[in-house]
């Protein structure tokens, strides 16, 4: 593509030599923040979101060329196709309509196979509201007539990571005296055992989240949870009718497989539907978010949807040059494809967002970790980066050393809020002072003269200064984005998540890959199913490669079958 070639030429001639510190110290430095930041009033409820991307190795020509690349890649056309319900998930022949789940336009019409999906979406939301309000108010009782106090979401992948992250992020909007939320995802029995250890079965509600209701990890955990529950309420000493009634009051399903759901013992009316045009990693906006609604209340859940909807409208209707997801996506392409950066760090300076990096580790890597183009040909360029991160300031005392002085360039997103929900003393000011300082330090660095002056003031000898000098120099010129919310609320969280979702979409279109399938998760699952029967006897295994045979046989010879 000509636009890629133009960017490559720009990178070789100018881009790779851009020094941010010199740019800020130049005659144009005073306007660099203004030129390369966007303050967008997403909505009255969300408020302003500030994206400062001035601390990147870019100039105006860089951005102009990146916007040309976006247009040539048909980002706008593909964006419109997604919102209109066209089947852009070509390998599964599906629409991609997580945006429809949060569409707040009362007159919206979005069709899939000729049918408007909006009425179905709103019907499920109404059902979620009715159910969550009954449970939270105490109207819905457990089998002994006690009020539900704990909800356990059993799922994996998108059926787990989204609700886990959002309930943590919105913890300030919950009341643990009304409802506590727990999550089980890992097939390791320890996860379930430790979760239910201190729960009372009479006041616990289980949500089984599986679209097909056949996901091995989820159904195995659900069956074990059911066994624990039945044993706790009396086991075989309790009649079948009582057991059936108890299961009906303590288990609900998020699924499309009514036959398997009812076979499990869950009542049909306690099954919450979602659709095949909702990818797992985009499903927190659907019935998969039921645990969120139970934890913080349906009003806050709908505010969460509304915030995402307002970001959707920004993405859909804003010119590329002013479009936050587009700008972030293009910057990622710049580093991935021209600087050869293989990872990106997400660093929220907000403890409530502690699971945000893990959530988008799945969101980004499962979406864009592809090596085949939409036309079936192998890609010839780098695609999805490795996503990782931890909340500040914890990361500063763990891995920032590598970001500052390591050999790898790691673009970083710093996220913070102007206001804290917990303004204890000077805690928030100290937190934000670190937020500001880290991006400045990564950009500016510390040169030899500055280190020499610093050590001289400390009274060190010239010999000692010479010894320490190379160790204390910071090269700087490390790229960062700063994202500022006014306050972390259901609205602003929804907008923030949608911002990252659309950034991932933009990159997938530019790389010409399908961001909405995940065939990479299938092979391991298939092989695990064939291996499982081999673990149930004492026979030596020889049907695999020597390494796999050796591992299986070591396990079998050392375990008590």
UniProtKB/Swiss-Prot annotation:
Record-level GO BP terms: gluconeogenesis; glucose 6-phosphate metabolic process; glycolytic process
UniProt feature coiled coil, ranges: none
Annotated InterPro entries: G6P_Isomerase (IPR001672), G6P_Isomerase_C (IPR023096), Phosphoglucose_isomerase_CS (IPR018189), SIS_dom_sf (IPR046348), SIS_PGI_1 (IPR035476), SIS_PGI_2 (IPR035482)
Matches recorded under Pfam families: PGI
EC number from the UniProt entry: 5.3.1.9
Signal peptide boundaries: none
Metabolic or biological pathway: Carbohydrate degradation; glycolysis; D-glyceraldehyde 3-phosphate and glycerone phosphate from D-glucose: step 2/4
Domain of life of the native organism: Eukaryota
Catalytic site positions: 366 (proton donor), 397, 525
Record keyword Cytoplasm present: yes
SUPFAM superfamilies noted in UniProt: SIS domain
Location(s) in or outside the cell: Cytoplasm
Similarity comment text for this entry: Belongs to the GPI family.
Protein name per UniProt: Glucose-6-phosphate isomerase
Protein species of origin: Dictyostelium discoideum
Gene this chain is encoded by: gpi
């Amino acid at each position: 593509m000509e636009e890629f070639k133009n960017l490559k030429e720009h990178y070789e001639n100018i881009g790779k030599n851009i020094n941010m510190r010199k740019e800020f110290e130049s005659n144009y430095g005073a306007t660099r923040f203004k030129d390369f930041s966007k303050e967008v009033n997403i909505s009255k409820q969300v408020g302003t979101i500030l994206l400062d991307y001035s601390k990147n190795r870019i100039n105006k020509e860089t951005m102009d060329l990146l916007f040309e690349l976006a247009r040539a890649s048909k980002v706008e056309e593909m964006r419109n196709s997604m919102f209109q319900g066209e089947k852009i998930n070509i390998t599964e022949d599906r629409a991609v309509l997580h945006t429809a789940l949060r569409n707040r336009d009362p007159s919206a019409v979005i069709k899939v196979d000729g049918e408007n999906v909006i009425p179905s979406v709103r019907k499920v939301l109404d059902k979620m509201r009715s159910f969550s309000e009954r449970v939270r108010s105490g109207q819905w009782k457990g089998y002994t007539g006690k009020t539900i106090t704990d909800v356990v979401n059993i799922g994996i992948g998108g059926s787990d990571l989204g609700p886990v992250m959002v309930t943590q992020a919105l913890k300030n909007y919950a009341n643990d005296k009304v409802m506590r939320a727990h999550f089980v995802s890992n097939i390791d029995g320890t996860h379930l055992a430790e979760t239910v250890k201190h729960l009372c079965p009479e006041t616990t509600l289980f949500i089984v989240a599986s679209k097909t209701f056949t996901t091995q990890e989820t159904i195995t955990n659900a069956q074990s949870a059911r066994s624990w529950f039945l044993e706790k309420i009396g086991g075989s000493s309790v009649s079948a009718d009582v057991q059936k009634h108890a299961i009906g009051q303590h288990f609900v399903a998020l699924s499309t497989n009514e036959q398997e759901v009812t076979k499990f013992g869950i009542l049909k009316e306690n099954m919450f539907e979602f659709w095949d045009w909702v990818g797992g990693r985009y499903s927190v906006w659907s019935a998969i978010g039921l645990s969120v609604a139970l934890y913080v209340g349906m009003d806050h859940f709908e505010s969460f949807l509304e915030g995402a909807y307002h970001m959707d409208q920004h993405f859909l209707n804003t010119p590329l040059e002013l479009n936050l997801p587009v700008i972030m996506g293009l910057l990622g392409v710049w580093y991935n494809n021209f600087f050869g950066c293989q990872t990106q760090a997400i660093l929220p300076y907000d403890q409530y967002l502690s699971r945000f990096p893990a959530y988008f580790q799945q969101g980004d890597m499962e979406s864009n970790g592809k090596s085949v183009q939409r036309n079936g040909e192998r890609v010839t360029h780098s695609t999805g980066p490795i996503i990782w991160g931890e909340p500040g300031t914890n990361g500063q005392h763990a891995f920032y050393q590598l970001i500052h002085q390591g050999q790898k360039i790691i673009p970083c997103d710093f996220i913070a809020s102007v206001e804290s929900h917990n303004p204890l003393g000077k805690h928030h000011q100290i937190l934000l002072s670190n937020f500001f300082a880290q991006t400045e330090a990564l950009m500016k660095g510390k040169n030899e003269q500055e280190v020499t002056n610093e050590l001289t003031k400390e009274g060190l000898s010239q010999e000692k200064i010479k010894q320490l000098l190379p160790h204390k120099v910071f090269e700087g010129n490390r790229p960062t984005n700063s994202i500022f919310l006014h306050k972390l609320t259901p609205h602003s969280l929804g907008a923030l998540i949608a911002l990252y979702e659309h950034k991932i979409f933009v990159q997938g279109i530019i790389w010409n890959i399908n961001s909405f399938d995940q065939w990479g998760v299938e092979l391991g699952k298939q092989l695990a199913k064939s291996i499982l029967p081999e673990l149930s006897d004492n026979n030596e295994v020889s049907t695999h490669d020597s390494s796999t045979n050796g591992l299986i046989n070591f396990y079998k010879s050392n375990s008590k079958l």
